[in-house]
Design a protein with these regions (language model features):
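Extracytoplasmic small-molecule ligand-binding "clamshell" domains
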Residues: 29-100, 236
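Short helix-initiation/N-cap motifs at beta->coil->alpha
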Residues: 61, 76-88, 170-185, 220
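Periplasmic-binding protein-like
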Residues: 42, 118-126, 195, 199-242, ...
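Acidic, polar ligand-binding/catalytic clefts
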Residues: 65, 74-137, 216
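Extended ligand-binding regions for polar small-molecule ligands
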Residues: 61-70, 136, 141-142, 147-150, ...
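A ligand-binding cleft/hinge motif common to bilobed small-molecule-binding domains
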Residues: 100-109, 154-158, 181-218
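C-terminal motif of bacterial Sec signal peptides marking the signal peptidase cleavage site
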Residues: 15-19
Length: 261
């Protein structure tokens, strides 16, 4: 009986070792997810916006499709609350911020940026019949901007001008389109906005209706926002962006949306 028991115990131990040991190959890992979720504001023409058919189009959309496609990724564009973009990135809800995203010192504390790929300015736009001609004329006026935008940062960085505005700061709107509409309705006196968007918008709506002031709130550059931890991904994107600039693809895509530039 003891011998039989010992044999049974030996068999059980052998089976246990076979199941737990390293002699059997480990299961193959699941295929890497190649989808990249990109956070966008779908009202930011011509970088990323809806066409008449409701399709998401624009310079950044074309650029992202080409660049990520070359790297073997599948881009997925996710419309987000632009004021929450860095939070969405940090929480892992999106993988990139890529939609006319201005490089600023405050944003560098939250995200890593690729190289700059497009120049921009924060310009002042009024209706054509406005008596506003200079920054000084904004004193006591209501100035519209997009919420949590680089336009807001640029105005507030000019402390002397910001202090003179009605309310001591710009009025913030969810989108630049909402801000423009408030100016058109006469509730706001001016809008501070990305030149890239403004030139496209006023050309579409009728340039004769608007006035662009000679003064502005400074020059800036657009970059792609990447999570701080994703350093290898950042390098991968940067290298491919450089390749696209060098081989002419970048300029070809840019020409579709900025024919005069």
């Amino acid at each position: 009986m003891k011998k039989l028991t010992a044999l049974l115990l030996s068999a059980i131990m052998a089976l246990s070792l076979t199941a737990c040991g390293g002699s059997e190959p480990a299961p193959a890992p699941e295929a890497e997810d190649k989808t990249v979720v990109i956070g966008v504001d779908d009202t930011f023409a011509p970088m990323g916006f809806r066409d008449e058919a409701g399709e998401l189009v624009g310079f950044d959309i074309d650029l992202a499709n080409e660049l990520l496609g070359r790297l073997g990724y599948e881009p997925k564009f996710q419309v987000i609350d632009w004021s929450m973009k860095e939070t969405e990135l940090d929480n892992g809800n999106i993988d990139l911020i890529w939609n006319g995203y201005t490089i600023t010192e405050s944003r560098k504390e939250k995200v890593n940026f690729t190289q700059a790929y497009l120049d921009n300015k924060q310009i002042i736009v009024t209706m054509a019949d406005s008596d506003i001609a200079t920054k000084a004329d904004l004193a006591g006026k209501t100035v519209a901007v997009q919420k949590e935008s680089s336009a807001y940062e640029a105005v507030m960085a000019d402390a002397a001008t910001a202090a003179t505005l009605a309310g001591g700061e710009p009025v913030q709107f969810d989108t630049n389109t909402d801000a423009f509409m408030d100016v058109e309705a006469g509730r706001s006196d001016a809008i501070v906005v990305d030149e890239v968007l403004a030139r496209y918008y006023i050309k579409l709506r009728g340039e004769e209706q608007y006035k662009v002031l000679a003064e502005d709130f400074g020059s800036e550059e657009y970059g792609i926002g990447v999570r701080k931890a994703d350093t290898e991904f950042l390098a991968e994107i940067d290298a491919e962006l450089t390749e696209m600039i060098n081989d002419g693809t970048f300029d070809e895509i840019k020409g579709r949306w900025f024919s005069a530039q």
